[in-house]
Amino acid sequence: MEENKQKALSAAVSQIERQFGKGSVMRMGDSTVSRDIEAISTGSLGLDIALGIGGLPKGRIVEIYGPESSGKTTLTLQVIAECQKMGGTAAFIDAEHALDPSYAQKLGVKVDELLVSQPDTGEQALEITDMLVRSAAVDVVIIDSVAALTPKAEIEGEMGDSHVGLQARLMSQALRKLTANIKRSNTLVIFINQIRMKIGVMFGSPETTTGGNALKFYASVRLDIRRIGSIKKGEEILGSETRVKVVKNKVAPPFKMTEFDILYNEGISRESEIINLGVQLNLIEKSGAWYSYKQEKIGQGKENVRLYLKENPQVAAELEQQIRTELLEKKLSVLASSSEDLFETIDD
């Protein structure tokens, strides 16, 4: 860069820093700029790998949507449990007034430490979210759900009154205000959303999410969660088979897909995922109905192997670490080295 241009740029940067504070503008190559994104595990090994960074990114907005009874709240409660395991603080904005503390406890949530709010209006819910985010003392805030964020005017109005676009305007205004505070405080904010059908759609999917388009733009990660089957033992249904698609991802390559089992009163079955991924990577050998690990038979049938891993957590932890190393850490090291090359090119 020419000397005069360099001087002009330095003067502009110093003026910006005087006016708006140090760090208002910086070079991406500076050592002070963090290139690593912190993540909180989802409680699902496969989903952590599909997200590319080992979980959901902190300092970002995430949207989880799907049909009813697809596992949206279960997944977010697992995120809270993982956050609390790391010593973090979580808040649950229960706009639907449907949080079941006993179910949350079964999934590993420390209910006594969980901050819960049951707001009356959408404005109140989003204002509480903003205050929690600005405190920079909360690691995860869950809003359940966007569809239940009813504007004050609608609550105070008559039943048949028309309030066109009121909720979409509320969401758009709130997200404009929230997004900078979320980044500054490094808080993970998760919005749970429901699916609606667009009328008169001839081509393409008629499905859409509630609350307008603002959340689609502001979300760094969007997850589409679907129930694809039931887990049965004879006639008894033990849980549901679930598929999650990463529809949008600003922090890693998107469009990855994963499947896992959600067991009633237990949550996401980590052991089932370890078995599936272990077999894929040849860490667990499968011969007919028998499964072996390190030349030792560990069970006949998937359910028996799942129980074996549950009773032997050290074996499960060892396998999980091998899977993470194989599928996640190698990928992250490749991404890190390629981004370093990019920054070096920019500096040159």
From Swiss-Prot:
SMART domains according to UniProt: AAA
Sections of the chain in a coiled coil: none
GO biological process, one term: SOS response
GO molecular function per UniProt: ATP binding; ATP hydrolysis activity; ATP-dependent DNA damage sensor activity; damaged DNA binding; single-stranded DNA binding
Known function: Can catalyze the hydrolysis of ATP in the presence of single-stranded DNA, the ATP-dependent uptake of single-stranded DNA by duplex DNA, and the ATP-dependent hybridization of homologous single-stranded DNAs. It interacts with LexA causing its activation and leading to its autocatalytic cleavage.
Matching PANTHER family: MITOCHONDRIAL DNA REPAIR PROTEIN RECA HOMOLOG-RELATED, RECA
Protein name, UniProt field: Protein RecA
Organism: Legionella pneumophila
